[in-house]
């Protein structure tokens, strides 16, 4: 099997990712992802964000030193810093709401732990990027916009945290993941592993999202 050209390879990853998004999006309402927000649900959503942001930083940080090109190593290190900054911002907001910033971090849902344990087990930078930054992280802006619209009326400060900081920062580093894959996923075996990592990562993410929504207070 020959390696695909970069744009053909990326198109295949995108097709797989978007097919999963369509499936997951169609199922979200059935397990309560769009239920009316309450202060308790908002707090739980913030605690979920703490786990997602901090874990993304942790699993990515170990690979930054292996990126051979400085023009990608530097922005990837800045990505890690941003994810930790977001973690701190979310923890601060949870504290302002008199919640426990580490509730879900210290007692993670089984499906959420399985998701990040999988990412931590991946054997290359490209597999991780395909699964996380090019994979399910692409869903974050989409679900966050819905959350912002619904939370604005009951908690405008939390809406501002997501809109003005988290989403704004996400937009600034969206280019990094595809460029890493273009540059380093150039052989057939790596491309195959990347596709598999994306598929598994999206499936595990879907299970984690479903479990999280089903665990929300009534």
Sequence positions of predicted segments:
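Non-heme di-metal
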Residues: 1-218
